[in-house]
Amino acid sequence: MKKIKIFSLLLAGSLCFTACDDYLTETPKHSLTTDNAVLDYSGAKNAVNGIYGVYETGGSNLGGYLYSYLQCMAGFWTYSNEMYSMSYKQSSSATASQWSQLYDIINTCNAAINGINKLDDSSFPSVADKNSLLGEARCFRGYCNLELLWLYGHWFDKADSPYGIIYRDQTSELSNLMVGRSTVGESYQYILDDLEFAEQNAPDYTTAYRMNKLFAKAMHAKLLLVRGWEGDYAKALTLVNELLANNSGWQMETDLAKLYENGWNSKENCFSHYLGDNTDSYYGISGYEFMYSYGFYYSNKFTDLVQEWLDNDARHDVTFGTARAPETWDTSTKDNILTKLYHRGRYAGKNDMYATYPMRYAELYLMKAELLARTNPSDIQGALAPLNEMRAKYTNPVLEPVTGISTHQELMDAIFKEYVVALFMENETPWFASLRFEHDGKPWIYTLKPEVNFSENQYCWPIPDDEIHAHSNVIEQNPGLE
């Protein structure tokens, strides 16, 4: 990809402020540019709504594809040998689309943020309304930059590591594309600045269709949990406790079947990749979630230990079932398909609820259990309590409490197993857990795929080849992934 192609792709994001649905607003009546896009309050709202339009139609590899790849890396699934073996290199095509899609969304965020900031406060009903729009856009930008760091940066390094993100806070033009990599510490700070602003100013949670204060706080807590620097666990625990104490509409879906039936309409889903406007296309909604609507049928076996956990869990009959093949020509059916995400598949259910679950309410209880276990390791039952509190809330299926835990290692193994089973293929959390939790003195990932040789350098993907070669300035590739 040449420099001019990168420019055209990125600029396209800033020009295409299309509304997602009536729940957002009407489509803008004029062609938007970075100069005229935000002229008044209505334009500011359209600019923010435009972010969702780019995400909806241009984020097809940021849901099931992404989460499935990460869980192949963890050793849960062998669908992609490249991901399972961690053999990706700079020339790999498998990891390029997530990069471009995230930056397209970030570019649209920047157009909205910068346009709103240029408007005088008097253009808005109130300063709070202005900041609410900024909070929504900055939450989106912070979330996308966090995904970039987690995927393409040394998120696991110290602050002075040079392998952070390529941070962009301006709409992309030829004059500003040649940006170098930030340090890991700088990258985290950019992300936290956006998330913390959103925690204070973004809209309250009312629906998983929109960015909101609670999602910003939850992703802030998850960032700290994954990063694990000094003081991070204590701070994350405070944030999680605040979220659990919040009497908002975000809450557990006690009937687990309803969670997956309702998807982005579920009260347990804090934010989701809304796809409801795409029912009229050839493949309908399923066309934007290939892995969920197709991949799980033809590769429906998971690695031995994980398959055993899933098969023997009380949630199995709710999350697995019988389904038809996704191809027109293939009339076969299979048992033990991950129907919580596959649903009926691309053929029989092209417009089924192929939702994503970046942050479910249930995950807060698991985060709290882990954080208590790490900040107060001697209190085993105290750390186990949130996990069992979460399990006790379910009415379909009814889950028995986890018992027989007497050592810290047994506690950590139980929490890890719950992360995997409860959130399987739904988001990136089980992948990070496979690196963070230890078993037999080393991260769980080594137990899950002992035959694979890898190093910490392979905990992230390479920056795509096109990006490296498009820069006139030197962009350092992640070590070992050249």
Language-model regions, residue ranges each:
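Conserved, well-structured interaction surfaces
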Residues: N81-Y152, S182, E199-D204, N351-T356, ...
